[in-house]
Amino acid sequence: MVRRILTVMIAFIGIAASGFVSEANDRYGKQKVVYHINYAGGESDKKYLGAMRNIQNHINAVGAENLEIKVVIHGNGIGVLKSAKVNEKLQSNVANLKSQNVSFDVCANTLKGKKLNFEKDLYDVFKEDIVPSGVAELSHLQQQGFTYIKP
């Protein structure tokens, strides 16, 4: 009897929760968003971890299938992918976001100016992730209808 009640309660909670997700998706619709990271992560990469959490919260609210998210990284923001080489929590966050089709666009000017090799110095960056200019990429994406967010 108790088992049956628990089963019914769990089923009800699942149905109710799916209604909230559906309602949120209906509210927000399809979105194209660019997140801008050009700052240092601070102590224990707290600012970077906070930015990754903001992006995940956005995905949770709208649904990955309704989002196209790009993270443009330049200047001191390059530290997010440098730190992810050694900070397992940050690495896990970046990998999780990438698995949800979030792309990380890295500024070539920053790589050159900071003398960084993206293959050796940064976590999970490939040639196709490099953009000529982070700032120009931000402008370009906004012209294409991406909403700008700086976490």
Which residues does each predicted region cover?
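Acidic helix-start/capping segments at beta-turn-to-alpha-helix junctions
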Residues: 68-81, 110-111
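Bacterial N-terminal signal peptides
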Residues: 8-16
